[in-house]
Amino acid sequence: MAILVTGGTKGIGLEIACRFAKPGTDVFLNYVTDRVAADSAARRVESLGAKAHLIEQDVGTPEGAQKVLDAVAPVTQRLDQLVHCAVRVMPVPILKVDLHEFTKAININATALLYLTKAALPVMGKGSTVFYLTSRGGRTAVKNYAAVGAAKALAESLVRYLVLELGPRGIRINCVAPSGVDTEALRNVYGERTDQVLQQNALDTPNGRGVVHDDYTALVEFLASPAAEMIQGQVIFVNGGQYLHA
């Protein structure tokens, strides 16, 4: 088995990679910067029995996405899971977003999904799955999250259209939206308010706790299984029912 995770050396991406890291599995971890974190992630994956492959490459361009898949091809002829988790966080008000930076956010958070999927088609086939990691910012307005939120909304729409072309090939694609998970990206958005936000998130769920890594990685594992064959083009939130309150 083989899995490719963009943004796979930290946070949610790394947790998903580790969920699939078993003996005999090739785990491709894409990153852009921070080699120290990448090496640490590779060691963690290999401690679980899998083989880790680090790929340093920006996926925000068609050329970059193709280079990532070019690194996969010599190792395996089949990619079972493609997980696009790379994110460019820009915690600024929308009216202050620089157009160049906004375009980068769209490219990395959204159109990279299309670039990667197209590049991966030669090594994906019946039973392969694609995942896009989204967030509630793609559906609701979150303060200082406009650039990323708009990109997430675009990517969710792309997923629905990709279903029409991937489905006949036997490839499934879905979005998973974990909410309120303590990650570096979340702390970049909320800064010194992060702990307060996490505590409030837990209080707002009917069962009184926040989302932990096992909650969403278990969902991804299920969606990658044959049992989820008829789940296509969905955005599935993992938030403990946080937003059910009137």
Regions found by a protein language model. Give the residues of each.
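A glycine/serine/threonine-rich, flexible loop-to-helix segment
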Residues: P168, G180-T205, H245-A246
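Conserved glycine-rich cofactor-binding loop
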Residues: T9-K10
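Substrate-binding pocket helix/loop in short-chain dehydrogenase/reductase
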Residues: P93-I94, D98-I106, V197, N201
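Alpha-helical segment proximal to the catalytic Tyr-Lys
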Residues: P122, L164-P168, E229
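Catalytic loop of short-chain dehydrogenase/reductase
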Residues: F131-A155, V159-P168, G180-V181
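Short C-terminal tail/terminal secondary-structure segment
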Residues: T140, E221, Q232-A246
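Conserved NAD(P)H cofactor-binding loop of Rossmann-fold oxidoreductase domains
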Residues: C85-M90, G241
